[in-house]
């Protein structure tokens, strides 16, 4: 259940969707703060990590066995991840979400393509034997999206259903490659016209049933789809539709 913590209303004319806001923050996050319990004394310990989202939106973490947080998690799997939108001005004016749960080990090789599409700079050490992959199994989330927008979000609301989307995820690497090789102009339109991002060589990083991820120079954005997709054909139709919407908006402007 989603529970509002403050009674103040959102800004007039803007509909606040806490689930969509939290989901976009997590899908777009490429770096985050990881909080664990120190193995030596039990104190809270916070470190900076790179992250990517799993198919259902849960965070994936690539961790070195030498890292202190790796030892902490080995002793107590409880952890939380803070993902924040970075921008100018007061950092507390920008939305952020904390996801908490327990870390479990996952097959690193099975997540390699997914990880490197979102964290390409880690390719040089991804296969090192002392690096392993963890997945935070979420139990809930806490979103701070501005004054009057402080909300608890249950994981069963936030997670992306994947049961009917095996075909989509099987095709995802090919979709990403095709978009970057043949349709970089479309990706640029999505970022600049639909998300209001600065112009640049935006790249397509990933897709799921509810949206797609776009990246430029270490920054990523999440573009929600107006309706759910579950196959490569669905994705193609959706991306063509969004190009039309982007061009129509450009012409109207």
Question: Whereabouts are the PLM-identified features?
Answer:
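Binding-site signature for planar aromatic cofactors or substrates
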Residues: 1-253
């Amino acid at each position: 259940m989603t529970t509002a913590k403050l009674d103040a209303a959102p800004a007039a004319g803007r509909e606040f969707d806490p689930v969509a806001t939290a989901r976009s923050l997590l899908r777009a996050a490429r770096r985050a703060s990881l909080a664990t319990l120190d193995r030596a004394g039990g104190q809270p310990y916070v470190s900076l990590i790179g992250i990517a989202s799993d198919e259902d939106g849960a965070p994936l973490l690539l961790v070195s066995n030498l890292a202190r947080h790796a030892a902490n998690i080995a002793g107590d799997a409880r952890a939380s991840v803070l993902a924040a939108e970075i921008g100018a001005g007061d950092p507390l004016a920008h939305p952020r979400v904390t996801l908490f749960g327990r870390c479990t080990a996952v097959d690193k090789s099975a997540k390699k393509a997914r990880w490197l599409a979102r964290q390409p700079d880690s390719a040089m050490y991804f296969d090192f034997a002392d690096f392993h992959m963890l997945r935070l199994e979420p139990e809930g989330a806490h979103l701070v999206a501005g004054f009057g927008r402080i909300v608890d979000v249950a994981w069963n609301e936030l997670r992306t259903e994947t049961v009917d989307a095996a075909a989509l995820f099987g095709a995802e690497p090919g979709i990403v490659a095709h978009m970057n090789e043949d349709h970089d102009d479309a990706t640029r339109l999505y970022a600049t016209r639909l998300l209001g991002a600065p112009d640049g060589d935006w790249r397509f990083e990933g897709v799921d049933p509810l949206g797609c991820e776009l990246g430029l120079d270490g920054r990523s954005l999440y573009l929600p789809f107006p309706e759910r997709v579950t196959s490569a054909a669905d994705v193609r139709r959706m991306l063509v539709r969004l190009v039309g919407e982007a061009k129509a908006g450009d012409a109207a402007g």
